[in-house]
């Protein structure tokens, strides 16, 4: 495992440990999302973890899928292991673009949609898969668990 990847393991584990401590201290008791962390909050948790990793200079992509009525979300490190698809520029009508921008949108609206093939070689970071009996913190490559989704 590369040094960079070991740092990601460290950061992800620190983040998960902190979230577990917050849960155990009952800070999340009245929180609709995190009250039973790490269960049933993989999407929101992945968004928070993405912000945290981003603050450490680690760009990520949000990935999610569904399998037999269950959904799951995780991150993929956006580095040289991920294929960057060609952006599809979407032309928005001026009125909609102005409305979008007024709510904090970006001036240039690009829709980049990654496919499974684009991210299949990427490094997965997942701190909520233990709700499915997987590892406490998973930093690694696609396996049978992630292929299901």
Task: Identify the residue ranges that each predicted region occupies.
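A structural boundary/capping signal
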Residues: 1-149
């Amino acid at each position: 495992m590369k040094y960079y990847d070991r740092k990601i393991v460290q950061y992800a584990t620190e983040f998960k440990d902190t979230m577990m401590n917050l849960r155990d201290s009952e800070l999340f008791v009245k929180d609709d999302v995190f009250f039973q962390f790490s269960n049933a909050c993989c999407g929101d948790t992945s968004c928070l973890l993405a912000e945290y990793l981003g603050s450490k200079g680690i760009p990520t992509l949000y990935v999610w899928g569904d399998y037999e009525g269950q959904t799951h979300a995780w991150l993929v490190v956006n580095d040289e292991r991920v294929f960057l698809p060609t952006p599809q520029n979407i032309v928005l009508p001026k009125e909609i673009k102005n409305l979008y921008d007024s709510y904090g949108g970006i001036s240039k609206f690009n829709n980049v949609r990654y496919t499974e093939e684009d991210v299949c070689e990427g490094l997965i970071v997942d701190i909520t898969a233990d709700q499915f009996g997987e590892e406490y913190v998973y930093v690694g490559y696609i396996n049978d668990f992630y292929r299901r989704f």
